[in-house]
Amino acid sequence: MSKVHVFDHPLIQHKLSYIRDVNTGTKEFRELVDEVGMLMAYEVTRDLELQDVDIETPVTKMTAKRLAGKKLAIVPILRAGLGMTDGILSLVPAARVGHIGLYRDPETLKAVEYFAKLPQDITERQIIVVDPMLATGASAIEAITSLKKRGAKNIRFMCLIAAPEGVEKMHEAHPDVDIYIAALDEKLNDKAYITPGLGDAGDRLFGTK
């Protein structure tokens, strides 16, 4: 069964309060999402493997630690997931970035993939799928399903806020995928918006509301 990691770090919660605030403008919203993405990435990458390397400092020779094992790939779900990507890249600049685009079918209400561009060695990488919100879970589930169909195995999902309904659906669909969130909100409303939530993350990031 997948685990849900909820971050209670004071800096994350402080910045999240401004992200939620309806009075926060597009520029500040974008900067805050980027910053929280970076802060969350510290914890999401906590268990990356290290290996010993011999180096020489200006004073003496020593054995130091560097990242080893599987390389990292970040896969934002278009378009809102783009807002969290640069924050992670600021910590792990060598990571590759893939993209998955989804839209909701107006009749079936299911998420349908319309675009996917991934690193060629995606099967060999540890993957962080990013999207600011986990509401119904449909988009995240479809994105992860798409990655698995392409051979990806080591996948994590990272978002700012989640609804219990979305978390439950993710557990059912992908019990092997851990979920990392800044806040677990109360519920979905009758329009499938997370409550209290932050509104439409894509519109607020790109000023299109």
Swiss-Prot record:
It comes from the Bacteria. Allosterically activated by GTP. It catalyses: UMP + diphosphate = 5-phospho-alpha-D-ribose 1-diphosphate + uracil. 5-phospho-alpha-D-ribose 1-diphosphate binds at R79, R104, D131, P132, M133, L134, A135, T136, G137, A138, S139, D200. The keyword Glycosyltransferase applies. GO terms for biological process: UMP salvage; uracil salvage. Pathway: Pyrimidine metabolism; UMP biosynthesis via salvage pathway; UMP from uracil: step 1/1. One of its GO terms (molecular function) is magnesium ion binding. Its EC number is 2.4.2.9. It is an enzyme of class 2 (transferase). Binds 1 Mg(2+) ion per subunit. The magnesium is bound as Mg-PRPP. Uracil binds at I194, G199, D200, A201. GO terms for cellular component: cytoplasm. Its cofactor is Mg(2+). Keywords: Allosteric enzyme, Glycosyltransferase, GTP-binding, Magnesium, Nucleotide-binding, Transferase. Belongs to the UPRTase family. Catalyzes the conversion of uracil and 5-phospho-alpha-D-ribose 1-diphosphate (PRPP) to UMP and diphosphate. This is Uracil phosphoribosyltransferase.
